[in-house]
Amino acid sequence: MEKIPYAILEKGSLLLASPDTDQGVFARSVILLCEHSLNGSFGLILNKTLGLELADDIFSFDKVTNNNIRFCMGGPLQANQMMLLHSCSEIPEQTLEICPSVYLGGDLSFLQEIAASDAGPMINLCFGYSGWQAGQLEREFLDGNWFLAPASYDYVFMDNPENLWSKILKDLGGKYASLSTVPENLFLN
């Protein structure tokens, strides 16, 4: 029996860019869909990390000892806006659960407290976001620009996010697994 592909476009879905997508930031992107409604959609790119360190002058931290904090480019829209994607369920009034054990939200005091601890929840500090107008994401999906997979804690906070796109395609199996080996630049093949 052939495995039926995941095809639910909703909060908690992962969007995987088709190998044909070569639109800059979206090339081989994995996006966690955080909101999807009749009014539009928004999500955060998980596998485009930024080589930043927490700057004391920006965040007013005395010290940063938590290695569970990762900087990500959430998307091309409002790149100066920061969103917290984390695994801490202890601040439910400020957060929205996106999928089991993955939350969106929080404030600077939460971030400061976590950054100063030796351990703690996983945090993706996402700068910017990816957004679609009403009906736009559905059209892109139907045009084959995106594949879908269910989100999970393990995918969202994977140790090597640069390998996330290939990992999920392999996990989906079948034709998707073979797509995971397509080189980024076909002209170099």
UniProtKB/Swiss-Prot annotation:
GO terms for cellular component: cytosol. Pfam families: DUF179. HAMAP family: UPF0301. Belongs to the UPF0301 (AlgH) family. This is UPF0301 protein CF0373. The lineage of its organism: Bacteria, Pseudomonadati, Chlamydiota, Chlamydiia, Chlamydiales.
